């Protein structure tokens, strides 16, 4: 059952130190599942993120006096809750229902709506009551276009679209809550099994025929794309996550 699988993933991460890769699939519960399953997944993610934050804090404390600050920031990020987000982007880019490039770009990107809701579900839980993750999460999503898919370069477009949607979710949330996003003081260390660095940022399709390619944040976001709230159920503290 979904609840049993959710429980196993939560237990594996919080009790046995499994990496964030195993947390990303829980966001898929945001779409096509009943409210009980969504709540179970949201509560599990909240528990997982709390555990990961402790893990990252313990790592920092352990190596603060022996590790260079830049290396410490980069390495501690790989232990953090927000490091789940790149894995979810990768997972969604490989999702069998991800629309083609042409279908996704049509009708203001409506075909990406379920994927946005899954990203919103994760981000809403990740930022519940805290803005600590925003600088690193935003930087990772912004720099995703300096990578290609390490397993299949032809799927890289999906990475860029998902990262742009996640970036939109993060920035809109920060605006709604009046949070300063700040700058993450370190480089990003990408999991090499999933992402391969490249020298230049990937370019998106021009806004009009014959125009210059789009570059930078939102370069791959469908024109006219707007966010729709995810069905984020109440968590254990009684508050709803907001996308």
Question: Regions from the language model: what does each represent?
Answer:
Residues 1-3, 14-18, 28-40:
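Short coil/turn segments at helix-helix junctions and helix-capping linkers
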Residues 1-9, 242:
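Short intrinsically disordered, low-complexity coil segments enriched in acidic
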Residues 7-11, 24, 28, 43-47, ...:
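Residue-level signature of alpha-solenoid helical repeat scaffolds
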Residues 13-20, 34, 49-56:
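Eukaryotic basic, amphipathic alpha-helical target segments in cytosolic regions
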Residues 21-28, 87, 121:
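Alpha-helical solenoid scaffolds in eukaryotic proteins
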Residues 42-243:
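Long internal repeat-built scaffold domains in very large eukaryotic proteins
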């Amino acid at each position: 059952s979904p609840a049993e699988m959710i429980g196993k993933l939560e237990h594996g991460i919080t009790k046995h130190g499994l990496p964030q890769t195993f947390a990303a699939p829980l966001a898929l519960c945001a779409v096509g599942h009943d409210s009980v399953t969504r709540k179970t997944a949201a509560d599990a993610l909240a528990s997982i993120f709390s555990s990961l934050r402790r893990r990252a804090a313990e790592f920092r404390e352990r190596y603060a006096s022996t590790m260079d600050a830049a290396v410490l920031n980069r390495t501690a990020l790989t232990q953090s809750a927000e490091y789940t987000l790149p894995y979810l982007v990768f997972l969604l880019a490989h999702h069998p229902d991800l629309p083609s490039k042409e279908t996704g770009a049509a009708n203001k990107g409506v075909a990406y709506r379920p994927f946005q809701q899954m990203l919103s579900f994760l981000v809403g839980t990740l930022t519940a009551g805290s803005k600590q993750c925003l600088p690193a999460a935003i930087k990772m999503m912004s720099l995703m276009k300096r990578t290609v898919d390490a397993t299949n370069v032809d799927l890289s477009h999906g990475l860029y679209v998902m990262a742009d949607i996640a970036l939109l979710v993060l920035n809109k949330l920060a605006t709604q809550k009046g949070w300063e996003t700040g700058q993450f003081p370190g480089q990003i260390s990408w999991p090499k099994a999933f992402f391969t660095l490249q020298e230049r940022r990937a370019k998106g399709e021009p806004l009009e025929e014959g125009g210059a390619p789009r570059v930078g944040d939102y370069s791959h976001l469908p024109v006219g794309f707007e966010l729709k709230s995810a069905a984020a159920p109440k968590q254990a503290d009684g508050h709803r996550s907001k996308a």
